[in-house]
Structure formats: structure tokens, C-alpha cells
């Protein structure tokens, strides 16, 4: 093969590799966006702005809690996109001064509004995202008890460990999703 032929072959190989790389990159990103969608954007953006919560955190919680299924129901009877229990829902209604009996956590806007309010409330109370997520999953009272235990919290504000494996796993899953949302969008 001549020098000119070798150069032409090398250029074709490099061009083909570049095209394959670009196609894989686009496909990989597209697949990640399918796995980590941004649904209910109008509600997430509205209420994350209103309650001072990073929208990516709201998406990460929804992804982890219900995988964007507004009809999801957990074993603990938490329902909707953000998986809230009826008791927590009623408590938040009093915090917001709302008495509407027709509100439903199966309604995406209601779920996002109340779940995002609760995340904002927990962020104000605990400040640390891992502690907030533990409280969202295990309950504020339980987490406040953990913070009083010197074996679990050395400063009374941050959890050194999360004593319930299911809650620790939940916090890791939300953080993974949060990392993906922060890097993907």
C-alpha cells in the first residue's frame, strides 16, 4: 500500500471512530435521560422556587420514591410521586393553613407541592442534605432522636451514621440520583 493509501485508510478509521464515539455518547446520554427523566417540570420548578429547594433534589426524591409514578403506593401507605403518608400530608396542610378536603396526593401537583414544602421545611430544620433525606424517609422525630445520641451524631446537627439500613440505603439512592441530575441536565 502506498503512503497516500495508508493516510487515506488512517483518516477513514479515525473518522469512523469519531462517528461511533459521537453516536455512543449521544445514545448514552439519551439512555440516561430516559432512566432519569425530568417529568412534571412545571410543578417541580414552581414549588422548588417557592420553597427554596434545589429542583434537582426534588427530581432525585421523586425518582427514588416513585420513579415518577403518580399512583405509587408504598408498604407504609405513602402515596403519590413523592410518597407521603396521609398523616404527614395532614400535618403539612396545617403548616400551610389549607383545609381543602378534596386534595389528593395522587394528584401530581399536590404531591410535588407538599413534598417540596416538606423538603424545604426539613432543610430549614436540619441544613445537612443527608440528614434531611434521612428525616424525609424515617421521620423528623426519629432523626431528632438520633441527633441527640452521641454515638450517632458528634455535633447534634449531622448524622455520622444512619442506624436503619433501609434509611441509609435510601439516602445513598437519592444522592446517586441527585448526582446524575446535577451532571446530566
Regions flagged by a language model, labelled:
Residues 1-6:
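N-terminal Lys/Arg-rich, disordered targeting/topogenic segments
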Residues 7-9, 174:
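Hydrophobic alpha-helical segments, especially transmembrane helices
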Residues 10-26:
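Hydrophobic membrane-insertion alpha-helices, especially the h-region
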Residues 23-185:
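Catalytic glycan-binding domains that act on GlcNAc-containing polysaccharides
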Amino acid at each position: 500500500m502506498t503512503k497516500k493509501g495508508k493516510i487515506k485508510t488512517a483518516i477513514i478509521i479515525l473518522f469512523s471512530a469519531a462517528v461511533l464515539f459521537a453516536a455512543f455518547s449521544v445514545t448514552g446520554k439519551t439512555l440516561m435521560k430516559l432512566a432519569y427523566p425530568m417529568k412534571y417540570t412545571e410543578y417541580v420548578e414552581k414549588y422548588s422556587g417557592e420553597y427554596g429547594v434545589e429542583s434537582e433534589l426534588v427530581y432525585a426524591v421523586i425518582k427514588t420514591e416513585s420513579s415518577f409514578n403518580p399512583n405509587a403506593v408504598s408498604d407504609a401507605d405513602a402515596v403519590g410521586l413523592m410518597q407521603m403518608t396521609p398523616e404527614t400530608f395532614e400535618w403539612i396542610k396545617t403548616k400551610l393553613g389549607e383545609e381543602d378536603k378534596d386534595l389528593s396526593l395522587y394528584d401530581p401537583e399536590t404531591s410535588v407541592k407538599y413534598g417540596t414544602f416538606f423538603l424545604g421545611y426539613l432543610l430549614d430544620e436540619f441544613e445537612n442534605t443527608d440528614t434531611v433525606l434521612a428525616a424525609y424517609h424515617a421521620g423528623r422525630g426519629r432523626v431528632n432522636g438520633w441527633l441527640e445520641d452521641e454515638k450517632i451524631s458528634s455535633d447534634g446537627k449531622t448524622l455520622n451514621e444512619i442506624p436503619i439500613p433501609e434509611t441509609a440505603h435510601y439516602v445513598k439512592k437519592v444522592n446517586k440520583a441527585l448526582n446524575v441530575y446535577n451532571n446530566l441536565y
